């Protein structure tokens, strides 16, 4: 009877340890997302683009002279991406291709507030950009990790606003490191990328890739889709 009781107690203790271990492993994604989520923003952009409404060579010269420039009307071209606040002054790190050559930038914070954004600079070679939001002393900013410490197989969590869906979190692993962007068909870039199987979709561009400690280890930049699951890539 004593031996049976001891075995039952021992099994119970092991079950508690296993349950605790599972709980801790199960919740690291939630903890990491809560740590960085308040610093993730949606970026909406707008630029005026002149589009020719007709081919002037196909119109009678007299009518063309009468219309003048009326056949060319500016249109508003809208874009959308993600970003992450990296300090309390409201500096947002994002992709250059999200905000370059735009006329207006609007930043939606995690709390729903919408701020005007000002592009401080873009680097098309590394596809990175800095945007300043006009809200001082913003307390929610993401801690930066060290991508040099990454190993293949480490957890990778992608945050952003794919297709405009805010506060989206996906989980995967680091599938490869130092992936040459030229091998993906971008000869004008100089990057070696983090490859991940965490789901990255249009609108995720500029959002953070974070580790299990809730630190930013990369900026999501592109996805290569095809048969089966897509491949995601982030700038370390």
Language model features with spans:
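Serine-dependent protease modules
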Residues: 15-236
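Bacterial N-terminal signal peptides
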Residues: 2-10
């Amino acid at each position: 009877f004593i031996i049976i009781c001891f075995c039952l107690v021992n099994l119970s203790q092991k079950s508690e340890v296993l349950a605790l271990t599972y709980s801790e492993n199960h919740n690291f994604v939630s903890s990491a997302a809560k740590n960085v989520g308040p610093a993730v923003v949606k970026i909406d952009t707008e630029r005026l683009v002149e589009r020719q409404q007709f081919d002037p060579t196909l119109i009678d010269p007299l009518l063309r002279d009468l219309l003048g420039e009326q056949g060319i009307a500016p249109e508003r071209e809208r874009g959308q991406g993600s970003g992450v606040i990296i300090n309390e002054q409201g500096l947002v790190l994002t992709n250059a291709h999200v905000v370059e050559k735009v006329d207006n930038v609007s930043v939606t914070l995690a709390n729903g507030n919408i701020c005007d954004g000002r592009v401080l600079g873009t680097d098309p070679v590394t596809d990175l950009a800095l945007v300043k939001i006009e809200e001082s002393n913003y307390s929610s900013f993401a801690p930066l990790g060290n991508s040099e410490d990454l190993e293949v197989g480490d957890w990778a969590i992608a945050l952003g606003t794919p297709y405009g869906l805010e506060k989206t979190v996906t989980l995967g692993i680091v599938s490869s490191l130092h992936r040459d962007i030229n091998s993906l068909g971008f000869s004008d870039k100089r990057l070696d990328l983090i490859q991940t199987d965490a789901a990255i979709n249009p609108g995720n561009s500029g959002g953070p890739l974070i580790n299990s400690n809730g630190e930013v280890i990369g900026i999501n930049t592109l996805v290569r889709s095809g048969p089966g699951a897509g491949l995601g890539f982030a700038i370390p």
